[in-house]
Design a protein with these regions (language model features):
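Nucleotide-sugar-dependent
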Residues: 245, 289-300, 305-326, 331-344
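A short, well-ordered alpha-helix in the C-terminal region of glycosyltransferases
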Residues: 362, 369, 376-390
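Nucleotide-activated donor-binding/catalytic signature segment of Leloir-type glycosyltransferases, i.e.
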Residues: 232, 263, 271-296
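Conserved donor-binding/catalytic core segment of Leloir-type glycosyltransferases
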Residues: 210, 229-245, 251-255, 263
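Carbohydrate-associated surface elements
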Residues: 41, 184, 206-209
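Membrane-proximal helix-turn-helix segments that form the acceptor-binding/catalytic region
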Residues: 101, 121-124, 128-132, 158-178
Length: 411
């Protein structure tokens, strides 16, 4: 098949969704498909276009399997400025739509167009490109954006909320297929399509995946040594510092357990809050994003990882970092809604524990239990790599995406 992919990030950009889409592309290429990616210039690490990529609105490179076209993302230096971020998404989306008519031959027919959300704005753009290129349109949902933004209070303007939900419904209805990461997300999308869905619309569940040949436990502690984390117990959160994450739990843990080293890796809208806390708490370390190739080393540095998602978001978001943590053999404490996809995953893998979201006491008890029982902590962590190999391999995900893109029934 000839496939066009529209996504916000792609290697060498360090965003988690970029890692996911890069893996999808590599898997499809291994299966013999011609791929043309339209994405942003790398910008995620410092929220500005990286110096070696700056100076042009677009850049195109030819690959052995197709091409990569990168366009300016118009990033906002302040992730809390939602208006500026929205305008940046609109500008990026417009450039993606304009440039996507060229890869693989000017407006030549393709077999399928795959667009990733967030940003939600790529939905209708993907549909328009698919119409122009006479291909099937598949909408890939990583997070149900309007729901998450509304529930965290990131968006409060009623007009903007109505517009976001309208755009979401239109994007779903225009798609030939929608892919989601869990049954919870599938239920969410199906409910919004109810009574208005096209008979041809398919909602397929394809969990994210990790390359466990690369993302594997790292012996030793080079990351600990580099950042002075010591030899004692280390509890880590690694990922986006956004409104959806209950980072106050990590700060409270550092405040109430001074004997434990607490590490928050990443960047985002809540960076200033985390940085301020780290200046007053000697056992709390804030470390910025590291190069993607260091991920196995970073995740292996912790004894315990925390995946904190605010109450009500468990059904609309599946933190892909969970798979990465399991791959390096570390146990997870998930502060997340009961019965959510991540809670079920940890129970199935026997690789961690789930606690109620936003509950400091529950987190303290869970950390105390694992720190106090090193054998159980190591046993839970040891279950992760095998579960990933059995359930979250790139090969299985690539086959599933191939079927959806080809129009085979998967839902």
């Amino acid at each position: 098949m000839k496939i066009i992919i529209l996504c916000p990030h792609f290697a060498p950009d360090t965003a988690p969704t970029g890692t996911v889409m890069t893996g999808i592309v590599e898997g499809l290429v291994d299966r013999g498909h011609e791929i043309h990616v339209v994405t942003s210039l790398p910008w995620y690490r410092d929220h500005q276009v990286e110096e070696e990529w700056s100076g042009r609105l677009t850049r195109t490179e030819t690959t052995e399997w197709g091409s990569i076209t990168r366009v300016h993302p118009f990033p906002s230096g302040d992730k809390r400025n939602l208006l500026r971020r929205a305008l940046g998404f609109i500008g990026f989306t417009a450039l993606v739509g304009i440039t996507a008519v060229r890869p693989g031959g000017w407006i030549r027919k393709v077999d399928a167009v795959l667009a990733m959300s967030p940003p939600l704005t790529l939905g209708l753009t993907g549909w328009l490109v698919a119409k122009l290129r006479r291909g099937r349109f598949v909408f890939n949902i990583q997070d149900v954006v309007p729901d998450a933004a509304v529930r965290t209070g990131a968006i409060t303007n009623r007009a903007i909320i109505r517009a976001a939900y309208l755009l979401e419904r239109l994007s779903y209805r225009c798609a030939d297929a929608v892919t989601v990461l869990s049954d919870d997300l599938a239920d969410n999308v199906n409910a919004k399509l109810e009574s208005r869905r096209s008979p041809s619309t398919d909602v397929a569940v394809i969990p994210n995946f990790v390359d466990n040949n690369w993302l594997a436990p790292v012996d030793g502690s080079p990351y600990r040594d580099e950042f002075g984390l010591g030899d004692g117990p280390v509890v880590m959160y690694a990922g986006n510092l956004g409104y959806s994450q209950s980072l106050d739990l990590m700060i409270a843990l550092a405040e109430q357990r001074p004997e434990i080293t607490v590490v928050i890796n990443g960047d985002g809208a809540m960076r200033d809050v985390v940085t301020e806390a780290a200046t007053r708490l000697s056992n709390l370390h804030h470390i910025g994003y590291q190069p993607a190739e260091r991920l196995p080393e970073v995740l292996s540095a912790a004894d315990i990882h925390v995946v904190p998602l605010r109450k009500g978001l468990g059904a609309v978001s599946v933190p892909s970092k969970t798979y990465s943590i399991l791959a390096v053999g570390k146990p997870v404490i998930a502060a997340i809604d009961e019965g959510s996809a991540v809670a079920r995953l940890l129970a199935d893998a026997n690789a961690g524990v789930s606690i109620p979201p936003d509950d400091v006491g529950a987190l303290l008890d869970a950390v105390d239990a694992l720190v106090g029982d090193r054998k159980r902590c190591e046993e839970l962590g040891a279950h992760g790599p095998q579960w990933v190999a059995d359930h979250a391999s790139p090969a299985a995900a690539s086959l599933a995406y191939e079927k959806v893109l080809a129009g085979e029934q998967t839902g």
